Amino acid sequence: MTQLAIGKPTPLGAHYDGQGVNFTLFSAHAERVELCVFDANGQEHRYDLPGHSGDIWHGYLPDARPGLRYGYRVHGPWQPAEGHRFNPAKLLIDPCARQIDGEFKDNPLLHAGHNEPDYRDNAAIAPKCVVVVDHYDWEDDAPPRTPWGSTIIYEAHVKGLTYLHPEIPVEIRGTYKALGHPVMINYLKQLGITALELLPVAQFASEPRLQRMGLSNYWGYNPVAMFALHPAYACSPETALDEFRDAIKALHKAGIEVILDIVLNHSAELDLDGPLFSLRGIDNRSYYWIREDGDYHNWTGCGNTLNLSHPAVVDYASACLRYWVETCHVDGFRFDLAAVMGRTPEFRQDAPLFTAIQNCPVLSQVKLIAEPWDIAPGGYQVGNFPPLFAEWNDHFRDAARRFWLHYDLPLGAFAGRFAASSDVFKRNDRLPSAAINLVTAHDGFTLRDCVCFNHKHNEANGEENRDGTNNNYSNNHGKEGLGGTLDLVERRRDSIHALLTTLLLSQGTPMLLAGDEHGHSQHGNNNAYCQDNQLTWLDWSQASSGLTAFTAALIHLRKRIPALMENRWWEEGDGNVRWLNRYAQPLSTDEWQNGPKQLQILLSDRFLIAINATLEVTEIVLPAGEWHAIPPFAGEDNPVITAVWQGPAHGLCVFQR
């Protein structure tokens, strides 16, 4: 039997050098680490890793080749009260594995035990890691590096975006390949999108609870192997990496960036009753935030929280991010529950992972977007991230919905959100683009559902409608559900137009949820994380071409307005913005706080957004000059000069002079 050589302690993971494979694994508390390799017949061969450099265990297997399947058995104490849960009866996934073979099924053998260890061997059913060799021709690929001020983000799910697209070949729908298909790229280009933000593509598992109900984790926020692509989105699992890179290369050629939603806050091992896949059995005490009683700090709502202040975990997370940039040429990241990244355990802007990213010549050059909260005390950190980060702006989301759908927001508060929420983000040398403005996202109502439902309808999720937020700031316009009279449909359409216009013509970085531009509905489900079906897949055959054209026209209009593209904070008298009342006069303090919901926003001295958010048709006197309505609010031919706009109830219009 071949013996392992000592090998070397870096880099982490399994790496083929042309003559064999070097294996490395971090564990500060292990007493012994076995490398387990499996031949074509599934026969297991075990090797003790002979090298032990600090907290890194390592060994070199001569003559090993790409395609080799492997895992680890890690020996150490079973001391739950101290946070140690070693169990060598369980085969473990390499945290840095780049491909996984097998499925993460709900099986008692994939659990280590709660108070007492489960010593039943699980190698026969446990997923295995696969050694991967990296040879890929990027040709002349170069990142688009779209300036933040010019960025338009489109948030989409790999499968849901294309699975029902009639113009994409059936055999590649719902896959990485489909993202790079000319039909999809042309659509994004015509819409005006500059960055495609993908929900998680790293290998994830469906929670046992969902599997027992016949459901699955659709969104992917339950990671198990952060370096490996989720194989279900590939035409062939063996070629997933190349399929993904082909798509990125094609998108880059079209000038479209790719941003990955990445989950560094927790793992699919969940709470202490959850499965044992990897980190818990490798070094539970180091990888997770552990309470004094040995249980987990659950600051994520998912059962556990990664300890991103531990030096080894910081190295692991940093290596993971660098891998996606260097190996896959991604252009940035959106970090789920990103407040966890700054916990020490209190949140700090100079937390170790933030500092590592700031000092990394690779990671400091890509787009970084934070979901700036977690569920722990002190977890709401909107506006408090380091300068390199942009942040999801929930202030904007709630303000836009309240203004147009609940009618209870003063003009001053609305204007503050329209101006990139400068009260929140204008600090630490940050620019307006730090505010990622959104009206909807993957979690919550779709845009159409915002105007069709007053209440969530999540019964299909199997939690008796308890899941999902109740604070939707939605308005069904008088009837719960889709459909209705022509008048109802038109009023809902007008509200959608108003929300889209507010999103796409505000200062800051706009993010559009895929499907909102053509009226996608989830039938009132505002937490469709476990709905891998027609509820979430975009139905292109039912798409509203009129709404799509309206959205595209708004995006292209945005690109013509210097005040929105220059990414500079607006200052009084700089010519970027003027705020006027219905008579084209500056608003008084009382009007800002208590006045009627009528406002004119003059941008770059040439573009005028006239707003009447009252219940009555109102005459709006435009500023001096020859004004004409412009697309998408009027045709391009034969512009009509006007000095007064008869503003319909809850309406708006954009003019140019």
UniProtKB/Swiss-Prot annotation:
Which GO terms fall under molecular function for this chain's record? Answer: glycogen debranching enzyme activity; hydrolase activity, hydrolyzing O-glycosyl compounds
What pathway or pathways are given for this protein in its record?
Answer: Glycan degradation; glycogen degradation
Report the record's Gene Ontology biological process terms: glycogen catabolic process
Q: What is its EC number?
A: 3.2.1.196
Q: Which UniProt keywords apply?
A: Carbohydrate metabolism, Glycogen metabolism, Glycosidase, Hydrolase
Q: Which reaction does it catalyse?
A: Hydrolysis of (1->6)-alpha-D-glucosidic linkages to branches with degrees of polymerization of three or four glucose residues in limit dextrin
**Region described as Disordered:** 460-479
Q: Where is this site: Transition state stabilizer?
A: D443
Give the signal peptide range: none
Cite the active-site annotation.
Answer: D336 (nucleophile), E371 (proton donor)
Q: Which SMART domains match?
A: Aamy
Reported function: Removes maltotriose and maltotetraose chains that are attached by 1,6-alpha-linkage to the limit dextrin main chain, generating a debranched limit dextrin.
Among HAMAP family, the record links this protein to: GlgX
Family listed: Belongs to the glycosyl hydrolase 13 family.
Q: What is this protein called?
A: Glycogen debranching enzyme
